[in-house]
Amino acid sequence: MMAHLAPLFLLLLLLLLPLHAAATPSAHPAYPNEPPSCAAAVPVPERREAHGGGRILDITHYYREDMPSWESDGGVGQFLWLPASMRNGSRANNSEMRLPTHTGTHVDAPGHVFQHYFDAGFDVDSLDLEVLNGLALLVDVPRDDNITAKMMESLHIPKGIQRVLFRTLNTDRQLMWKKEFDTSYVGFMEDGAQWLVDNTDIKLVGIDYLSVAAFDDLIPSHLVLLKNRDIILVEGLKLENIMPGIYSLHCLPLRLRGAEGSPIRCILIK
């Protein structure tokens, strides 16, 4: 008797299987039940340096393992991990990140070089967003020297200009694209920093390597620029292929309380 019923049972099972599959939800809502077509195009992300038909310019370096790190020949190294991976059974991909706050395009807070400011809480969260956002002048610096008082005077930066991005030989040499830290980068000498403080209305200084201060005047220049807590330093900017002139600058650091520096995303709008 059972032998006669076996074929009928198998037939019934085969008929019910499609219904069961249709009623069973996908293992993950991000993936459809239907297998992907072999002819389906795989989407490719678009990497852009300009947006809005060239009106919005990204002047932030993207983070990579071989970007320069302060006084290191090995670059930043691995800074991103994926401890939770959908490929390994997690419900979502979740990355972790660890890197120095003064790496890539970043901002300095007064506590970077003043211990009493650091202790008092003059951190990244205390920076004035109005200073970090507004009209800015992009200038080309003479390529033969660091930024001295004489050079600052020769630039003839008008009074009233509050934000200046200094493009230097660092951009021509593509130093931010080299893994090895280079002490010969162009930056402010102490007298150039003092001239800026004494003779201009500049409240934001941007430059195209990891420090606004020349390596030989590293701390003295920082002290001059950050002493009064009214100047913000943005370092490691990507300024190639941009015409000098006036732009609308928008920079937003991470809101890090207790940190004297932070990665920052900066754009220019024509």
Swiss-Prot record:
Reported induction: Induced by cold, salt and drought stresses. Induced by abscisic acid, auxine, brassinosteroid, ethylene, gibberellin, jasmonate, kinetin, reactive oxygen species and salicylate.
InterPro entries associated with the record: KFase/CYL (IPR007325), KFase_sf (IPR037175)
Tissue: Highly expressed in leaf sheaths. leaf collars and flag leaves. Expressed in roots, stems, glumes, young panicles and pistils.
GO biological process: L-tryptophan catabolic process to kynurenine
Coarse class of the protein's main subcellular location: secreted
Keyword terms of this UniProt record: Extracellular matrix, Secreted, Signal, Stress response
Segments traversing the membrane: none
One cellular-component annotation, GO: extracellular region
PANTHER family from the UniProt entry: CYCLASE-LIKE PROTEIN 2
Family: Belongs to the Cyclase 1 superfamily.
Record-given protein name: Cyclase-like protein 3
Organism of origin: Oryza sativa subsp. japonica (Rice)
Upper classification of the organism: Eukaryota, Viridiplantae, Streptophyta, Embryophyta, Tracheophyta
Gene responsible for this protein: CYL3
